[in-house]
């Protein structure tokens, strides 16, 4: 689960992390009071969407102006003008795709007098089962670009959760950022604060880009991106309360209600599969035969008829889907349950695109019988390769 920048900063501030003062704004008419409360003389007006690259992004609407999603204002009138332009407009960045995202919230923040910019992030290293720190003196830019062009400027080290963060980890961060004296001490303190917040809130990633040194000699978090481990959210109702469903894919929200593992993609062939490994293999073979999957969807091992029907409805709700491939290897999941769910869903929502079904495993004969006797126009497949070729051919009109 992701949250907005202003929410991430407020959360980090609870752990003592230094941030600039700011006020979230949801309506243009609230920007004046927010700017006056901060005082100025310089303000930063930031679009709040769940995507990076906001500063270099562009709004679709001409009425939003030709500046990006992060704007510097030097007067309260300019703050108000930016708020009117940006709220409700659609911001397109390198991470939103061409459709962009509507800006429903702004964060008006005190401007910072910046001397240096750094990059600092924490994430779960699944290979070592430790918390990894990623540090670079190249802040304020895309870290992927740094990794590609000058990888030697990125330094990583890990913290063992069994022992927790230690003073030497803070010194390692200070050294990586080439800080000394009081700034080194600030970096050491910040390292402990960030790690404590990361663990306490069960974060999956905490990215600060940039972490800045002000001309007054203070370390400050200028931008923060936080994502949480969804499996741990039950422990953190205060985090769940921060969820902004308008930033999420509507189909993914619906899937979560049925405990379905669904991820929307950009292709045209919808997939319903049981098991994450088989789902990925199904996506791979669709691509092998020249087309792209429209989604990742794992219905799990113990899905009911109702759950399968819900999954099918979610797939058909995607206007980009031009064909559907159901690929089930029944172990715990029974093929007849899948068949009943598919038939029920198709009869309710109709079938306007080709459907290929490959069933194998527990109750496979009964499952095939249910589908064949349903009267539906379903293409049966004998194996995964056969299924992929049939759905690709059907979608292409062959």
UniProtKB/Swiss-Prot annotation:
Lineage per the UniProt record: Bacteria, Pseudomonadati, Pseudomonadota, Alphaproteobacteria, Hyphomicrobiales
Membrane listed as a keyword: no
Gene: sucC
Alphabetized HAMAP family for the sequence: Succ_CoA_beta (MF_00558)
Binding site for Mg(2+): 209, 223
Catalytic activity of the protein: succinate + ATP + CoA = succinyl-CoA + ADP + phosphate; GTP + succinate + CoA = succinyl-CoA + GDP + phosphate
Record InterPro entries: ATP-grasp, ATP-grasp_succ-CoA_synth-type, ATP_grasp_subdomain_1, SUCC_ACL_C, Succ_CoA_ligase-like_bsu, Succinyl-CoA_synth-like
GO cellular component term, pick one: succinate-CoA ligase complex
Function statement: Succinyl-CoA synthetase functions in the citric acid cycle (TCA), coupling the hydrolysis of succinyl-CoA to the synthesis of either ATP or GTP and thus represents the only step of substrate-level phosphorylation in the TCA. The beta subunit provides nucleotide specificity of the enzyme and binds the substrate succinate, while the binding sites for coenzyme A and phosphate are found in the alpha subunit.
Keyword set includes Secreted: no
Name recorded for this polypeptide: Succinate--CoA ligase [ADP-forming] subunit beta
SUPFAM superfamilies to which the protein is assigned, alphabetical: Glutathione synthetase ATP-binding domain-like (SSF56059), Succinyl-CoA synthetase domains (SSF52210)
One Pfam family per UniProt: ATP-grasp_2
Domain ATP-grasp span(s) in chain numbering: 9-254
Keyword terms: ATP-binding, Ligase, Magnesium, Metal-binding, Nucleotide-binding, Tricarboxylic acid cycle
Comment on bound cofactor: Binds 1 Mg(2+) ion per subunit.
Transmembrane annotation, as ranges: none
Enzyme Commission (EC) number: 6.2.1.5
Enzyme class, broadest EC rank: ligase
GO molecular function term, any single one: succinate-CoA ligase (ADP-forming) activity
Cofactor needs: Mg(2+)
Subunit structure: Heterotetramer of two alpha and two beta subunits.
GO BP term, example: succinyl-CoA metabolic process
């Amino acid at each position: 689960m992701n949250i907005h920048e202003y929410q991430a900063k407020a959360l980090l501030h609870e752990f003592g992390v230094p941030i600039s003062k700011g006020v979230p704004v949801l309506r243009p008419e609230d920007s004046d009071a927010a700017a006056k409360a901060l005082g100025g003389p310089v303000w930063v007006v930031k679009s709040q969407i769940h995507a990076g690259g906001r500063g270099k992004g562009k709004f679709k609407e001409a009425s939003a102006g030709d500046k990006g999603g992060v704007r510097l204002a030097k007067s309260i009138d300019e703050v108000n003008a930016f708020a009117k332009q940006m709220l409700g407009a659609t911001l397109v960045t390198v991470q939103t795709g061409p459709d962009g995202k509507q800006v429903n919230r702004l964060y008006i923040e005190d401007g910072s007098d910046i001397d240096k910019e750094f990059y600092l992030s924490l994430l779960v290293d699944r290979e070592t089962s430790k918390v990894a720190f990623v540090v670079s003196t190249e802040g304020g830019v895309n870290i992927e670009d740094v990794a590609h062009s000058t990888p030697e400027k990125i330094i990583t080290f890990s913290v063992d959760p069994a022992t927790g963060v230690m003073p030497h980890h803070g010194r390692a961060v200070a050294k990586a950022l080439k800080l000394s004296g009081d700034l080194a001490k600030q970096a050491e303190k910040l390292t402990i604060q960030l790690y404590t917040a990361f663990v306490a809130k069960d974060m999956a990633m905490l990215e600060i880009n940039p972490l800045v040194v002000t001309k007054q000699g203070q370390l400050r978090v200028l931008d923060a991106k936080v994502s949480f481990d969804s499996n741990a959210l039950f422990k953190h109702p205060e985090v769940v309360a921060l969820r902004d469903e308008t930033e999420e894919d509507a189909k993914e929200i619906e899937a979560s209600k049925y405990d379905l593992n669904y991820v929307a993609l950009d292709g045209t062939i919808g997939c319903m599969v049981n098991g994450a490994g088989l789902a990925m293999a199904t996506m791979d073979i669709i691509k092998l035969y020249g087309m792209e999957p429209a989604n990742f969807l794992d219905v799990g091992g113990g899905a009911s008829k109702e759950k399968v029907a819900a999954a099918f409805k979610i797939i058909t709700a995607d206007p980009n889907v031009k064909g559907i491939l159901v690929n089930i290897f029944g172990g715990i999941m029974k093929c007849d349950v899948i068949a009943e769910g598919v038939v029920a869903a198709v009869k309710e929502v109709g079938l306007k695109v080709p459907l290929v079904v490959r069933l194998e495993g527990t109750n496979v004969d009964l499952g095939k019988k249910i589908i064949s006797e349903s009267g539906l126009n379903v293409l049966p497949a004998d194996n995964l390769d056969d299924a992929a070729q049939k759905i690709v051919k059907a979608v292409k009109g062959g």
